[in-house]
Amino acid sequence: MILAVGVAILITLSGCGQYVPGTYTEEKSFEDIMSGPDINVSLSGDQNSGSTPKALEDLQIHHIDVGDGSSTLVIAPNGETMLIDSGPREANGSEVISYLEEVNVSRIDHLVATNPDPSHIGGHAAVIHHFETNHDGIGQAYGSGVSTSSETYTEYTSALREHDLARYNVASGYQLPFGAETRVAVINPPRTGTDSNGPETNSVALSIHYDDFTYLITSDAGRQAERRMANQYPDQINADVYQVGNHGESTSSTDLFFEMVAPSATIISSGQNGEHGSPSREVMQRLESTGVETYWTATHGDTVIISNGTDFQVRTQMNHTTDAGEIGSISIGATEMVVPAGQVDTRRPHTELGL
């Protein structure tokens, strides 16, 4: 796999630190990417530009570019793996399986379905069949307990039964077992019973902690769920990196919630032609107003967060601005990628990426 790397940039999270615009280097191999410097953020306030996370010694969070959907691979420092969602039904898990093969994942210890929408579990059945047949299988599966009658959901549950896999319904207050060093807290759906507003409100939301580093993923949880999480888990939602809710749609990342999350970097997972116009101008303006670094899989491609618990780095498949205002100015309806003036589109299709 070829990923694009930037120079090392160090900031503090003390409230006064800011990113300094950096220049970009030549494209590098996957091995170079995973061992070399990139955007380096200190969580402790101690500037240590020599601190470079290494594969399987740190927490890795891979945002796989699946188009109009979401799929996130988390690798714990001990090598344990968690796949959160698998992208849209149209792709049938092909991009996810290809990516997992490229990064040498032979077993998925934890498979999470944040909600039964096809943009999140579209590849679950294919991923289960592939790893149960060709590799070391799937450990355990987790979901919100909300079901649908869709063909995609039926295929997913059929695959679970076919391969005799256990599935656990989780709720706020639960913790998922994920290595000795990493804590994965479930903060949605409510433990008192699923909300009547449907699958999105009941999306599984996870707060992932590794020492001083916190990552927040809320799937499609909307305003009502965000209010509840803000009231019940104010410390859990405060995060260094936030995967923007509902692919950047205006139904999520509300003002108060985003203010309490207070991230240093945000990731938006959606396609260039988002089904519901994601990311929305409202959300992009909110991100722009805070100056937070923003990464969009439609413009940055596969995006990897690496943290040693003190610092975190952001590595992207493609060089692109991280200014939310500039990203928000891209035409959502464009049929081809719009590249800002002075930048070159170096994206490569998955079929041309190799280790």
Spans of features found by a protein language model:
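Sec-dependent bacterial lipoprotein signal peptides
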Residues: 1-14
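Non-globular, low-confidence helical/coil segments that flank catalytic cores
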Residues: 13-355
